[in-house]
Amino acid sequence: MNEKSIRVLEYGKMIDRLEERCLSAMAKEKARELRPIQSFGEITQLQSETSEAQSILIQRGNIPLGGIHDIKQYLRKTEIGSYLDPKELLLVKDTLRTARNLKSFFKEGDDQTKHPIVSGLIQGLQSFRAIEDRIEICIVSDTEISDHASSTLKNIRRQISSKNDAVRNKLNGIINSSTTQKYLQDAIITMRQDRYVVPVKQEHRGNVPGLIHDQSSSGATLFVEPMAVVQLNNELRELKIKEHIEIERILMEIAEMIAQYATEMRNNQIILTAIDFVFAKGKLSLEMKGVEPLLNVEGNVHIKNGRHPLLNADEVVPTNLWIGETFQTLVITGPNTGGKTVTLKTLGLLSMMAQSGLHVPADYGTRLAIFDQIFADIGDEQSIEQSLSTFSSHMTNIVNIVEEVTSNSLVLFDELGAGTDPTEGAALGMAILNHLREMNVTTVATTHYSELKQYALTNEGVENASVEFDVATLSPTYRLLIGVPGKSNAFEISKKLGLPDGLVQRAKRFLSQDTIHFEDLLQNIEKNRRESEIERQEAKRIRLEAEKFAEGYEDRKQRLEAQRDQILRDAKKEAYRLVKEAKMDSEHIIKGLREMKFELEAKEMNKKMEDAKNQLTGKMNDLSDHHQQILNKKNKKPPKNLKPGDAVRILSLNQVGHVLNEVDPKGEVQVQAGIMKVNMHISNLERVSPEKDIQQSGTGKIMKSKTGDTKSEVDVRGKNLEEAMLEIDKYLDDSYIVGLTQVTIIHGVGTGVLKAGIKQMLKKNKHVRTHREGVYGEGGMGVTIVELK
């Protein structure tokens, strides 16, 4: 790829952002070396791995990638028979542990079919737990070996400690002696050349027998090893030599363990570097709200709401740009600071990013072509040393482009033909565009020249575009309008700024009639476009309001039908309760009458029995009336000749279903109503038309469709909080109606706003019994498990 264009389009700044998201030095180096490529297959593979990393990060959050180090040189040392120092061993251990943790992390929750590339990398990692544990036991810090590294080392260090105590006790006796103290500079014990000594005054060197190891800078103090501790110091020295030998043996033993698997560990490091790099691309995609573009080799480009990734995401105006299908050359006109150059850079940079395997900040459905070269002549890059003018600098770039361009290249010109006489500059611009058009090169150029606007209007394969300018506010809107040539607006701006109208009219008289007619035509086109845009926006608003109203109506309808179903269920329960209560009352009355049998005379007893009978009859009549209102029976005669498959209505439930078996001797049949199978007497049934009545039965229709359509999970990732709330509320109602007891809400990790809002909503929902965060295997922090009543 052209290095000048890489610099001009600020591709390096995107690489810097990618490098910042890499954790290891090797992955950072890999990021710095990333360049656009031309192979369709390789680019597709790189895009797929970025998409997999983005998906995993959304579902599971950050992955355990800390602790990846460059251990190649340490592995080489072990292979040639050298041992590693404690610091080097700790770096090896960290890298091995990261590989093992990654394998464990993905083994617990990743679906290999969803992320085949990342899963393939993870499967290539090997664990070396025994070597990890050995290093963990032996190495305490960058400079210290643990006492537990071996029993021999522990024993030697115990002896060293004991010998140290013996030497210090002996020396304490000497420095605390009243005879010796007057010869000492200070009553302290110190070390010189790894041996214990005491500070003796120069003039009393003969009063303290021993070996002199050092003296102070002034010469006033001699550091003497008293003869009484020489033998102890010698023994201590021998023990420290033994300690050093044992430590070397331990380090060599660990190095030999590592050397056996040096090749596998080297492969681990390569894979870990690749994983670190892939997830850095995934993090970058998430942060800039990137998408995987649809790639092609036909030169077709369609950027949907593309955003320049280096500009503030909250302020940048999205660009919609297409080229390659009906035209290969696009001429953009418009005011300065209107966004023309940003549009060029957005197209060039997004194309480079896509060909590097990076996602692009745009909407789904964005299409980008794979170019063999991307050329950009943008900005004034003249060299002071070369003493080139603006025009000469641009023309030097254009000469290089014309020499190297192919039919599969993308060429971007900023202010084509500028910096010289306008007439000659416009002529050169048209000649250059014509040459590239004849080569079928994809070309986008910005200009102020009216001649180039007319060139685009009169030549096939060339299209005009403009950046919108609001004359009322004297400011650009930064919107790109393809198919609409830009108007200069010089006269309108001058009038708005206060230039007398007479001067403006006089200026217009200096223009040719063709130019005036052309500008008037552009003004009419712009006026019609604005009116059409207003009408389109109004139509869109009305359509959205209608869709919103329809959704609300359907939602309210379903809620009312669900409430009706619940009322029917409650009424049925109440009817059964009243029947049971009446039965208990009758039994109580009869029992009382029996007790009165021997106490009352026959006449009185008969009268009481008659009263009781009337009381019972009245209660049963009341119950019958109440039950009749609830069930609302429509037929008096039960249906005859019912057979399996017949469509019937259950009068007590107002549910439509199908007969499952023949009528039994008791006059009962089994009926399938939605998800329920119930035994019903034929007196509680009426025959219905199989198609008409089933469709007319709101409850039956809803129950049937809900049962078939309602799933055990709902995915609201990518929606804002309000949209997610509406969808989840409706989903919980549907799930409750069809009898689901547990459902899953997939919301992703993200910023946590969506998850928090859903949590508050679930606390208030009448159908929810409990809810909790998902565990590994269910989706972790990215899902919420809901138990329904």
From Swiss-Prot:
Please list the GO biological process terms of this entry: mismatch repair; negative regulation of DNA recombination; rescue of stalled ribosome
Entry's InterPro entries? DNA_mismatch_repair_MutS_C, DNA_mismatch_repair_MutS_core, DNA_mismatch_repair_MutS_sf, MSSS, MutS, MutS2, P-loop_NTPase, Smr_dom
Q: Record-annotated residues binding ATP?
A: 334-341
Q: Which CDD domains match?
A: ABC_MutS2
User: According to the lineage, what is the superkingdom?
Assistant: Bacteria
Xref: Gene3D superfamilies: 3.30.1370.110, P-loop containing nucleotide triphosphate hydrolases
What EC class does the entry list? hydrolase
- Domain Smr intervals: 714-789
Which family does the record claim for this protein? Answer: Belongs to the DNA mismatch repair MutS family. MutS2 subfamily.
Its job:
Endonuclease that is involved in the suppression of homologous recombination and thus may have a key role in the control of bacterial genetic diversity. Acts as a ribosome collision sensor, splitting the ribosome into its 2 subunits. Detects stalled/collided 70S ribosomes which it binds and splits by an ATP-hydrolysis driven conformational change. Acts upstream of the ribosome quality control system (RQC), a ribosome-associated complex that mediates the extraction of incompletely synthesized nascent chains from stalled ribosomes and their subsequent degradation. Probably generates substrates for RQC.
* Name this polypeptide is given: Endonuclease MutS2
From what organism does this protein derive?
A: Alkaliphilus metalliredigens (strain QYMF)
